[in-house]
Regions:
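Bacterial N-terminal signal peptides that target proteins for export
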Residues: 1-7
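Mature, structured domains of secreted/extracytosolic soluble proteins
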Residues: 20-184
């Protein structure tokens, strides 16, 4: 009887621990994202963000995004970069285009840790369209698409949907987006 009771409690404890392991941050690019790691430490493990990581390295922004922040990063997937006109990514990755690449990448970053609930509050307070100032200095507008998905609008009129939200990091938060947003 005692042995059976111990086994039951052990199995219950294992079930609770296993259930808790899956809670919290989502899986991005096939890998679990950890809130104890910084933006770069998590991003390098996402199979969906290899182009973004290569671009951050080419622009010299890795050290910045490993820093204390906090930062909110709207992180385009590889598929988002694939939507750009042919040759755009290769051109931006050339050393002579580092300034242009940095401008595009820092346009995807906002100072502070802005969660989905924060974005929704801003949208509501702004009558449906909230304005964010990026680290690059430009503006992004945040709205609700179909009443349930957060959508970004860039200075050129392009839009991106947040596909995975609230990927919390030790130095901020990542929101995965399906399109690269572009500054003026």
């Amino acid at each position: 009887m005692n042995r059976r009771l111990i086994l039951t409690f052990a199995l219950l404890a294992l079930a609770i621990t296993s259930a808790g392991a899956g809670m919290g941050n989502p899986v991005v690019g096939g890998k679990q994202m950890y809130p104890t790691k910084n933006i770069i430490e998590n991003a390098v493990h996402s199979a969906d963000h290899t182009t973004l990581v290569a671009a951050l390295k080419a622009a010299g922004l890795v050290e910045t995004l490993e820093g204390p922040g906090p930062f909110t990063v709207f992180a385009p997937t590889n598929g988002a970069f694939d939507k750009l006109p042919t040759g755009t990514v290769d051109t931006l990755l050339k050393p002579e285009n580092k300034a242009a690449l940095t401008k595009v990448l820092t346009y995807h970053v906002v100072s502070g840790r802005i969660s989905t609930s924060d974005l929704l509050k801003k949208i509501k307070q702004s009558n449906g369209s909230a304005e964010l100032t990026t680290v690059e200095g430009g503006k992004l507008w945040v709205t609700l698409h179909d009443g349930k998905h957060i959508m970004l609008k860039d200075e050129k009129g392009g839009t991106a949907l947040v596909t995975i939200a609230n990927v919390f990091q030790s130095n901020g938060v990542i929101h995965v987006i399906d399109t690269v947003v572009m500054p003026n």
